[in-house]
């Protein structure tokens, strides 16, 4: 969500801001020129898994193990995701004002942590996070 802008409809799609729509056109041109591939918009990543506890529930004839969800998962939605030179780039377009707004700094830290975990698991720097600040 962008805080100090209004939604823009361009190219048959809705963007959160003019800046995001403009950046999409730059990325689309790069894809058309073969510089990047697999351009996607609004890709969701789970940054905090749901919190589940196991409870024993006593029924009339037996006791059953039940998984109870205490907290839902938290997600981060990236503005753009694409492949460039063998890397998966996760890109966020922000204004300076939005950078400081509400939960973005925390979500940025959590997505960076998630990317580091994915890269460590793979043993290579396959994922990269980029911020475009305008």
Predicted stretch roles:
Residues 1-134:
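Electrostatic, structured charged patches in enzyme active sites and in nucleic-acid/phosphate-binding
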């Amino acid at each position: 969500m962008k805080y100090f802008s209004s939604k823009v409809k361009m190219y048959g799609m809705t963007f959160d801001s003019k800046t995001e729509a403009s950046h999409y056109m730059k990325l689309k041109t790069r894809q058309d020129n073969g510089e990047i591939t697999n351009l996607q918009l609004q890709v969701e990543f789970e940054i905090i898994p749901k919190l589940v506890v196991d409870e024993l529930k006593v029924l009339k004839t037996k006791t059953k193990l039940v998984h109870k969800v205490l907290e839902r998962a938290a997600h981060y939605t990236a503005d753009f995701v694409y492949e460039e030179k063998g890397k998966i780039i996760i890109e966020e377009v922000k204004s300076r004002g939005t950078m400081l707004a509400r939960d973005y700094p925390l979500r940025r830290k959590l997505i960076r942590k998630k990317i580091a975990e994915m890269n460590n698991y793979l043993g290579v720097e396959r994922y990269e996070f980029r911020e475009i600040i305008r």
